[in-house]
Amino acid sequence: MKQTTMISAKDTNKKWYIVDAENKTVGRLATQVALVLRGKHKVDFTPHINNGDHVIIINAEKAIFSGKKESNKFYYHHSMHPGGLKKRSVEVQRELDATKILERAIRLMLPKNVQGSNQYRALHVFKGSNHPFAAQKPEVLEISTKKGDVK
């Protein structure tokens, strides 16, 4: 009888991927990147082992939203003081720090535990096409732009 093989933390080998976010929808990009960060694209996925890969996202400021979300979508946070609710539209957030848009979208798709925190550290988002990880020789990760088109 065959036994199910479980990998251990020392058996993981992490690859580096690079994604160009130019003209990619934020939500579709975030879901596919979150799967790679978790390692669910691998055959030997194990829920309790962090065997996800590193992902570098370039041109984060050129990612797009569908519909009118650019002006109608808001990010909320609260200072925990009375009257401390703050809100910021996507337009304003893009001007202040465009990388936070993708970072937040991807972070909220990862598990809300220690494992998710470790997987989130493997995400590297940059404005423009320059990044300091050329020495890792990242492979290009193709992100589908159509609904239902997974590569």
From Swiss-Prot:
Record-linked SUPFAM superfamilies: Ribosomal protein L13
InterPro entries: Ribosomal_uL13 (IPR005822), Ribosomal_uL13_bac-type (IPR005823), Ribosomal_uL13_sf (IPR036899)
Subunit comment: Part of the 50S ribosomal subunit.
A molecular function GO annotation: structural constituent of ribosome
Species this protein is from: Mycoplasma mycoides subsp. mycoides SC (strain CCUG 32753 / NCTC 10114 / PG1)
GO cellular component entries: cytosolic large ribosomal subunit
Pfam family, one: Ribosomal_L13
Transport among keywords: no
Alphabetical UniProt keywords: Ribonucleoprotein, Ribosomal protein
Function: This protein is one of the early assembly proteins of the 50S ribosomal subunit, although it is not seen to bind rRNA by itself. It is important during the early stages of 50S assembly.
Single biological process term from Gene Ontology: translation
Record-given protein name: Large ribosomal subunit protein uL13
PANTHER family named among the record's database cross-references: LARGE RIBOSOMAL SUBUNIT PROTEIN UL13M, RIBOSOMAL PROTEIN L13
Homology family: Belongs to the universal ribosomal protein uL13 family.
HAMAP family reported in the protein's UniProt record: Ribosomal_uL13 (MF_01366)
